[in-house]
Amino acid sequence: MKNTAKLLLLSLAVLAAGACSKSLSEQMKLADNVKIDCNPEVLALVGDKIPVELTVTYPEGYFHPKAMLDVTPVLVYGGGEEMAGPTFTYQGEKVLDNFKVVSKYGGTVREKFSFDYDEGMEQAYLELRGVARYNGKDIPLPAVKVADGVILTQLLADAHGAYSFKKDDYQAVLHEQTEGQVMYDYNSSVVKGSELRSRSIRELQAALEEIASDPRYTVRGTSVVAYASPEGGQEYNAKLSDDRAASAQKAWSKVTGGDAPDNLEVRSVGQDWDGFREAIENSDIVDRDLILRVLSMYSDPAVREREIKNMSAVYTEINKSVFPELRRARFITEVDYQNFTDEELTDLSQRAIDVLDEEGMLRVASISEDPARKAELYQKAVDKFESDRARFNLAALALDDERPDAALRQLDAIRNQDSDVMNAKGVAELQRGDRAAAAEWFRKAGTPEAKANLGLVELLDGNYAAAADQLKGTKGVNGAIADILAGRLDEAEAAVTCNCGRAEYVRAIIAARKGDAAGVRTHLANLEAKDKRLYEQSRKDVEFAKFR
């Protein structure tokens, strides 16, 4: 804003008129030529401050050599509240002091200062108040308005911080498998009666009875898989495996009482090298590593068998403790188990919560709409299962309520300090007002949420170009706001993708800065329909002053 400081400076001229050769009318003409430029013409919040740069240009002869002038910028806002800036003192050339000297030949004075932001400053004006001092007299001078309004667009940003609750691994449908097996004698395909009465088969039968009696179970498939131990040659073992598959298929009818499924799958594997490898890995055989190296070096079954037989001492132990466990047929039933529904979980959490495992407790907490109940369930999961995810979610609930100290206590207790925990700690520091500490945590976390939060820190610090770069491609309106404040209106327009009230507000600002009056009206009308509170705020916003 450019002003002639006529009232302010004329008084100084009048005060010193007796010592000057110029007439009063000439002094008035000089005062008319004094100009004050305010940059920006409309003040704006940048970070935590409202910066101002004043440039005063004055003509030759306006300042008496023995006069002094105190000038105080004052921001008047809200219902008449005032915030005074620093007082600047100027002196004539013959004053013996250490203030800025104003030459009688004229010149320019520049001052930079800032105001702290306070609520209500969207409706404000900046004025200069002066006191002239000459020959022992102090005369207050009339105030001069130099700027109107404060742009607070930065405050539209969502400054809460981005974080997500830890998810549960609850499965609506559990894929399960139950099995039993029968063992065969060396080179035999006969299923002995004792095998059908073995513990393995009894446990399988009990499991099948439970599956049949529980409507939550659905059988997906049943298979009989037969094997031969890798001894005696590949061709011979292939036939032996086939014979065992046939005998096992008949045995299955006895195991199930004749209820063989229509989709029974029967497979013959032949030599069971995979089972052999697993058995060796889990054994305490002295030359275990050597045997495993042979398996990795050779793929030909005959070569493998020959090399292992050459280890005579080892082969005796293998023949005694490993091969017998591979002469078998497996009965496998695969089922789907329909887990508790959300409604059932909620009911169980109220009357029999100890039935729930960790995943069930995390799921029922996640679907609860009552924050207090969520916290109760997460705390139960912490107490019963020492659940880090539940503890993290307790921290997230605290952040929701902007209780950063409570959140940090939970986060510090988590055993696995992963990137999500680091990001959440950054949000807690952000809510505590320590943006530098928050930024450090966000950099350590390195997640997409942390990157967006780092952009938010740049935005709140007033580093708009850096903020726009960090927030590019993120959800929400913060990226668009950073683009607006960085002067990238086209990028800002493209960045707003949602249709919420805050987005309409941002679109209206973009339209206003582009001089699009119709766009301003359209988006403010949309804002009124979507968010009455923000609409009322927009009515005071200096961004739209030219369109009212």
Please place each PLM-identified region on the residue numbering.
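N-terminal targeting segments with Sec-dependent signals, encompassing both cleavable signal peptides
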Residues: 2-239, 243-507, 511-540, 545-546
